[in-house]
């Protein structure tokens, strides 16, 4: 499995956080015609709210370029849905930023399972421009901080860490 392909995903929403579709979710009243929704979405693609983060926060130093792009685009998309008129508060941006970082962090957690040490050291954070306080974002299914998990492994499990000729551990 190519980890570079999965690293291109901006966000990962776990299915267990979304309720299963049930008949009571459907309506017998008027609802939104998808043509209008599709046209609205097409028009909103022309606008970008990516700079909303910079007004209030700065992204942490541990995010690589793919992470920064993914978080900015996810925040922009969430703000377009929640505040299409462009008027949002610092708290609105914080909520969207935290959610975007959690969604991107989930991508990294899956990559950690596939790619091992390459994606091991992932610390997502953002810094408040006013207070300069740094906030770290984690997810419930986040893996441990140890290379080899504690406890007795299942029979046949082997952990191997070596140093390459380049000096990189992997």
How would you label these PLM feature ranges?
Residues 1-170:
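C-terminal regulatory/interaction module of P-loop NTP-utilizing enzymes
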